Regions:
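"…centered on the first transmembrane helix and the immediately adjacent amphipathic helix/loop
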Residues: 2-69
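Membrane-interface helix-boundary motifs at transmembrane edges
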Residues: 9-16, 71-79, 133-134
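Alpha-helical transmembrane segments of integral membrane proteins
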Residues: 17-21, 55, 79-87, 111, ...
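Short helix-capping/hinge motifs at transmembrane helix termini and TM-loop junctions
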Residues: 35-36, 72, 103-104, 131
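Interfacial helix-loop-helix junctions of multi-pass membrane proteins
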Residues: 41-44, 93-118
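Membrane-interfacial alpha-helical segments at the cytosolic side of multi-pass membrane proteins
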Residues: 60-74, 118-131
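Functional transmembrane or membrane-interface alpha-helices that line membrane-embedded catalytic
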Residues: 82, 106-133
């Protein structure tokens, strides 16, 4: 094996390692979104103030942020940021259908999809702003 080949393998491993927090976050969000409704804690004031929407926004922002971070130095980072954002939005929509049809005592809420999309959109805005600041400097 040539040293260049080994360098490429090490580079690929190091790129993969950067995605480990994102994969863990994905697994946690999947778990949280698929908990049956009767296992969710009943907190009276959460429903009153729509705190669950803030949880959705922060959860999907974090998920997209952790997938966006490793690509920040890639040449085609703008394209990857768009792919990650669209994938996050589609994941949020898909999980609402999963909750509706496959998870007992969970409901389908369009407002949850909107909150998920807002979280992904905030991540997109944050990274685009950061990329454009570096570009103009």
């Amino acid at each position: 094996m040539t040293p260049l080949f080994l360098f490429k393998i090490n580079l690929m491993k190091s790129r993969f390692i950067l995605f480990i927090p994102a994969v863990i976050c994905f697994a946690v969000t999947f778990y949280l979104l698929t908990i049956p409704g009767n296992h969710l804690p009943k907190i009276e004031w959460v429903g009153k103030f729509q705190v669950d929407k803030l949880i959705h926004i922060s959860m999907f922002f974090t998920l997209c942020f952790l997938f966006s971070y490793p690509v920040k130095n890639w040449i085609d980072k703008y394209n990857w940021l768009l792919y990650i954002t669209i994938s996050g939005i589609l994941y949020g929509i898909a999980m609402e259908f999963v909750q509706k049809y496959f998870i007992p005592l969970r409901s389908f809420e369009i407002n949850d999809m909107i909150a998920d999309s807002i979280g992904c959109g905030i991540n997109y805005w944050w990274w685009r702003r950061k990329y454009d600041q570096v570009k103009s400097a």
